[in-house]
């Protein structure tokens, strides 16, 4: 019997990961600016290092679920759909 699905290729995983980073980066930056918060301000509220916020906003870091929740609560904004 044939499998009903295929495992994703490395290229598909890399593409999905990059798209997710872009969605998260845009969401964090837009939500933060809408609240007129600096990266430092968001970092202080969320209990996250400012460099981490910067790396997330620039798409250079994939945050953990815990970090996403901290940011979401701090921005009073729902985490966007990633895939």
Pin down the residues of each PLM region.
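N-terminal flexible/basic segments that precede or flank functional cores
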Residues: 1-30, 34
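Short alpha-helical elements of helix-turn-helix
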Residues: 26, 50, 65-68
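Short basic helix-loop element that most often maps to the first helix and adjoining turn
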Residues: 26-41, 45, 70
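Residues in the helix-turn-helix
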Residues: 41, 52, 81
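Recognition helix of helix-turn-helix/homeodomain-like DNA-binding domains
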Residues: 47-62
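DNA major-groove recognition helix of helix-turn-helix/homeodomain DNA-binding modules
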Residues: 64-81
């Amino acid at each position: 019997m044939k499998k009903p699905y295929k495992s994703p290729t490395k290229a598909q995983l890399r593409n999905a990961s990059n798209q997710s980073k872009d969605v998260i980066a845009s969401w964090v930056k837009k939500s933060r600016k809408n609240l007129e918060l600096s990266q430092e301000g968001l970092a202080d509220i969320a209990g996250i290092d400012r460099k981490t916020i910067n790396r997330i906003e620039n798409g250079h870091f994939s945050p953990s679920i815990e970090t996403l929740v901290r940011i979401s609560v701090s921005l009073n904004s729902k985490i966007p759909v990633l895939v």
